[in-house]
Amino acid sequence: MLVTLGIVFGDIGTSPLYVMKAILHVGQRVDEPMILGALSCIIWTLTLQTTVKYVLVALRADNHGEGGILALYALLRRHKRKWIYLLALMGAGTLLADGIITPAITVTTAIEGLESVSPHLPVLPITLAIITVVFFVQRFGTESIGKSFGGFMLLWFLLLGAVGTISLVSYPQVIRALNPYYALRLLATSPEWFLVLGAAFLCTTGAEALYSDLGHCGRRNITVSWAFVKTMLILNYLGQGAWILCHADVAASVNPFYAIMPQGLLIFSIVMATGAAIVASQALISGTFSILSEAMNLDFWPRMRIKHPTHVKGQLFIPAVNMAMYIGVVLILLLFRDSSHMEAAYGLAITITMLMATLLLGFYLRQRGVSRILCMVFVGSYCVIEGIFLAANLSKFLAGGWCTLLIAGVLFCMMLVWVRAKRIRRQHISSKPLSDYYQIISDIKADDRIPKYASNLVYVNHTGKESTVDDKLIYSIINKQPKRADHYWLINLEYVDAPDTLEYSCSTLVEDTLYSVTMRIGFRIEPRVSLYLRQVVEDLVAEGRVDLTSCYPSLRRYGVAGDFRFIIIHRVYYPEDSFDRRYNLLMSLYALIGKISIDEPKALGLDTSVVVVERVPLILSRREGHVRRIVPALPEGE
């Protein structure tokens, strides 16, 4: 339970810092109908979006215990509607964009509380310093401080509930906001309902984390914890509303979150708010690493260098992403400078994430046998609700919403180009029946006149089938330079829907000569082919299926194992080989995006000292015509 509070609820738990302030910022008046309506919008947004959609429905759509929009897509990627991947790309792109704005707004709002103590305190430099420290410590892992997050967030939520309850006593009538009538009345009668609804939506921006962190905490822990968290949040929102109605003349000029704090707790609350903002930022950063790791294994994103700073399962650190996020957060801070301006940039991207999740959930429920009518009711209802939220947040586009939408758009386009280019490359891999080459491979092994290339020669076969082989792979063994070896190993990598799967099967195709190994890897598992192959070989040796002792007498007498060499076939696209401008543009962008990627041997976890990369042309379309022979004219008289 405590761990769940620290991991899952950091983002949604810091929303009281800025939601009511944002509502006061966009509202034209401060009176009872507006405040009760706004509070009712908050309460029922939390109920419909977080409780019903995510806690009651989405948490049941688990992929072997894992959650999140990419885990959900992994369950659906074999769906007959092949365009479903676009929903996952859009949802992932907007979720990653939200991960850049969240640390900026939460930490800034927390530090702005110091202005009530010292109005001339430089908020921006302090915020930049805290953000810098948060991103710097990622490289060392957060195992030690992460253990204290749960207890800290428990204290934070108790503080929210306690001060909210104390403030609620001053205007108990505010509890009427629990009735959805006041939200509906605001939407029907208030000219600024659109802006108020866009601000109220910020209360649920952390709801996606409940689903994304399903694998870390479990459905039961999240469900039980949410009952406590939601109660504390509602008490705090009601307390802020009560204070606003009692101080309507000055409410718009202060942050009601800090205004309801007893004077003796003000400094303590600022410290707690800053700590909660750091916890929320940490959760978003770690979540970004996890999302991109999944995207890499789903072939949505280029392979990047991943580090494991601690022994905790699932704790990742991606240096390039950490630096990119840090630069993005700093630019957001320098561009908007204070939380009031950041509120306009916040919420738009995550609305799109939720809308994409709704559509994917609809396909999932239908796939699981839920009736078509119920699926249509669920998807239709939430498309209407989230469509209204999206329209409300689009009203903030020019004021700052363009920023996160631009980030999300760039990320979506990068992923789309990567996916489309990868598919085209796979489509142009020519495969041949492997059985046609059994005899010639055996003959090469037996031909002493061919210099031995390696004791064990390993290829990664990209056809995806054990019965077929990439023609360029065969060309490498037979034609390019005949490669004699004692054993030939063909590795087939199969990425499966189950997140933590790691298993293999091995077939002996030619006795004591040719072996095919299929490795089934879950989308949360980092591929480390060298390590996995070593385990496979050890199993085969123990079973007596292969003898790996060196063939050289001077080494064999001491039981020294033969060497391994890996051959990687790398296809290179040359734009001048094609007149197709569409292919040229797509593959040029693919090559540009690929510059942030590590090379294939490192991506597969191979020992680069024993890897040879052979480059071959990737031909997508051929130029028409042929070389014309010129016959020289014979001298006269001949």
Question: What is each of the regions a protein language model found here?
Answer:
Residues 1-638:
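The structured alpha-helical core of multi-pass membrane proteins
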